[in-house]
């Protein structure tokens, strides 16, 4: 085990200061929230600068700063390139965001689209898929908080995980999507500056030649461009990233919240800004052998290398950068999943007659409950972050084609869309267990595509797009 790079006392001070700052900022921003539209969708009036920043910061998750180095450490060059291909999800979602805003100007969630477009059968399947993914991502973020604190300060995993979850739940609860988007803007600046600085120090202090020599001597397979598992991971991660964004209410809620004409530009800018970040964070993992670092768990390699390069003062800097990345994703996911539970489960199934004022109160309780459930599920650290995240790939990749065809083609029916998601998920999970985590999304996406193509060939009725405009119940 490695010696802690910063003292436990310093870590606690940083957490307290940042926690008070974010929670106070969330309270200040949330003072004028009066309606469910204000709380869930920031008044549907977010401009280009904040829109681009929140999309980019949300996608720079703790997984980008912890899992990208882990996958580079395991799969080499293709690991970091494969992870960076998740930017395609943001870039390809850009035209879809415009289409979503046009079709559903009064929409709340992605669940609204599936329910109206495909009917309740496909909607139920989609909700199960979406919640399984959301909980997987929430757990990975909570775990990442505990791993971060433990790696850099020696603070117990459970303490770190609890504190970071409490901070993010606190300011999301007080400020809603306004607080999420505003803090994302600040966190984006911290992340971009921090990642570039750490990458530059690694390049200057260790050097490409030394990194290449140590990796080729100790782990030559990481430099092999024909490494079979790494190639499968590359294509798997492309479809995983696309599925994550296309189906998740995190991104749909922003499409609804952004001002008219902003969504397409914002997602394109954020995708291009995000693209190099996993390459930089993955690159530092290749320096681990040259620095004599052999982490007990591969998902600890990123913080340990960065702390080694920058020393104790630098470790504080690393801590702040990764904490910002963690918070920028956790708050967004809490808010978006709460919206889905409130709008689709509570109003859609349990209490159809609920007023907007009542939903405003319910959504806050849902955020609190989600935070508590995530904390309980994070207590046993069951797997590595990479494996947990890719487990959800089988769920999300099955939704890609039903959503794409549903937005642009009027002939795909609900039975086929629901079957595509269900069969894709099941067969993807079988592939995850029988072959490996690096093929789950690829298999799921392929099965879903086949079912959707069969549906397009056999189904003759055409959907009336005006039903989405009217938001039929």
Question: For each of these PLM feature ranges, what is it?
Answer:
Residues 1-473:
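Membrane-embedded helix-loop-helix hairpins and adjacent transmembrane boundary segments
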């Amino acid at each position: 085990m490695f010696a802690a790079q910063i003292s436990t006392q310093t870590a606690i001070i940083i957490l307290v200061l940042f926690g008070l700052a974010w929670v106070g900022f969330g309270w200040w921003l949330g003072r004028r929230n009066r309606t469910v539209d204000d709380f869930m969708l920031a008044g549907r009036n977010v401009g280009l600068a904040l829109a681009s920043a929140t999309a980019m910061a949300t996608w720079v998750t703790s997984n980008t700063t912890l899992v990208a180095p882990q996958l580079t450490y395991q799969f080499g060059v293709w690991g970091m390139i494969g992870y960076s291909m998740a930017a395609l999800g943001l870039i390809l979602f850009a035209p879809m965001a415009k289409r979503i805003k046009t079709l559903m100007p009064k929409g709340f969630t992605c669940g609204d689209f599936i329910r109206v477009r495909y009917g309740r059968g496909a909607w139920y399947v989609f909700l199960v898929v979406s919640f399984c993914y959301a909980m997987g991502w929430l757990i990975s973020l909570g775990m990442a908080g505990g791993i971060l604190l433990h790696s850099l300060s020696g603070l117990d995993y459970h303490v770190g995980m609890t504190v970071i979850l409490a901070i993010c739940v606190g300011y999301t609860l007080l400020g809603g999507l306004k607080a999420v988007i505003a803090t994302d803007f600040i966190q984006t600046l911290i992340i971009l500056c921090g990642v570039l600085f750490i990458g530059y120090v690694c390049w200057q202090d260790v050097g490409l030649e030394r990194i290449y020599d140590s990796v080729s001597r100790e782990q030559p397979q990481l430099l092999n461009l024909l490494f079979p598992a790494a190639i499968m991971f590359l294509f798997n991660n492309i479809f995983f990233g696309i599925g994550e964004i296309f189906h998740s209410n995190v991104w749909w809620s922003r499409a609804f919240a952004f001002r008219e004409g902003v969504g397409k530009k914002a997602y394109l800018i954020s995708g291009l800004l995000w693209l190099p970040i996993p390459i930089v964070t993955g690159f530092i993992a290749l320096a681990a052998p040259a620095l004599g670092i052999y982490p007990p768990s591969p998902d600890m390699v990123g913080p340990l290398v960065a702390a080694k390069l920058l020393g104790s003062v630098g470790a504080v800097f690393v801590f702040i950068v990764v904490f910002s990345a963690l918070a920028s994703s956790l708050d967004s996911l809490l808010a978006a999943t709460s919206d889905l539970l409130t709008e689709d489960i509570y109003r859609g199934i349990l209490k159809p007659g609920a007023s907007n004022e009542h939903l405003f109160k319910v959504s806050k309780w849902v955020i609190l409950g989600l935070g508590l459930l995530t904390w309980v599920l994070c207590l046993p650290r069951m797997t590595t972050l990479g494996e947990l995240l890719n487990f959800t790939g089988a769920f999300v990749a099955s939704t890609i084609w039903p959503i794409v065809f549903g937005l642009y083609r009027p002939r795909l029916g609900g039975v086929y869309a629901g079957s595509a998601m269900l069969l894709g998920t099941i067969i993807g999970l079988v592939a995850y267990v029988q072959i490996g985590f690096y093929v789950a999304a690829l298999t799921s996406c392929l099965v879903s595509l086949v079912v959707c193509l069969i549906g397009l060939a056999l189904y003759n009725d055409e959907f009336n797009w005006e039903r989405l405009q009217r938001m039929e119940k």
